[in-house]
Each structure stands twice: as structure tokens, then as C-alpha cells.
Amino acid sequence: FPQDAYDYWHPLYELAHQLDPQNRPVTLVCCQNDYTKDITTRTMDIVCINRYYGWYNLSGDLDNAAYAFKKELDFWETIDKPLILSEYGADTVAGMHGFAPEMFTEEFQVEYYRTINGCLDERRFVVGEWPWNFADFSTQQGPMRVGSCNRKGLFTRERTPKLAAHYFRDRWGKKEPNDR
């Protein structure tokens, strides 16, 4: 499988560079796969990864999620290319609170982002982060989606901010670029 992906994507990568007179960077997103066997993503100009440590992987265990994510970041750092965490998040039911940050509470979503962002902030090669998602959105019904809704938004479907929206306002509102 990794070789088949490379054989498909790498010629497109080369063609994009060949056709672009401005020589803009080319990337693709590495989803929840075995990153150590991925031979395609590492050939791109920018490494983009979608990761859900602490949510789908190591669900609710933020300490071990941070450990696993740091281990993966160690791997990507050896590739010597800029990295963007292109998708990450935790479902949150707006208005659901708890004394401890348990999954689906607004407090957990904030702790999730603090944990993952703490890992990112330690790495100079990380050049961006894209939380999933701006706002909750409708999805196909199923056992993982209460009310047929993906609730990873920083805002509700009605655009009411969750606690995480305030967290990111503070995070992104800092003046210095390295003052993450």
C-alpha cells in the first residue's frame, strides 16, 4: 500500500511543480495511518498530518496522548520539513460541563487543545495548526454522532462560542509569532 500511494501521488507532485511558474509548495494530508511506513508524505514540500491523539486514539487519556504525539513529532522532525497539524479536535456537547475534564465536556475540549498545542509549541518545525472544526456541522446519522452532528466545532451550529473558542482567541491573539 505505501508504494502504491507513492506511485500515484509522486508524479502528481512533480507535475504540480513542473506546471507552476511560481514554484509554490505542494503537499497532501497524511491521515490516521502508520506514519513510519508512509513514504509519500515525507516527499512533499510541507508535511500535513491529521491526528486525533486523545480522541479517537488513546481516548480521554491526554497524558498518554501527549506522549504518543510527541513520539510521532520526533519522527517527523527527522524529515527536516515544515509540518502543519492539518486536522485535530475533540467532540464537545455545548453546555456540557464537568468537575473534571471528561470527554464531551467543554472543559475536556479545552484541555485536549492545551495538551496537543503544548506538544506543537515545543517544535520549531511546526508551522501551523488547523483545529477541526470552526463550527459543529450536520453529518450522516450513526452511533457516534448524537443528533447527526459532528461536534468538534469551536462554535455551535448557531455560531455560539464554546470554551475552546475563547481558548483559541487568547492563543492566537498573542502579539509575538513565537509567543505561542
Where do the protein language model's features map onto the residues?
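Active-site groove signature of glycoside hydrolases
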Residues: 1-3
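Substrate-binding clefts and catalytic carboxylate motifs of secreted carbohydrate-active enzymes
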Residues: 6-180
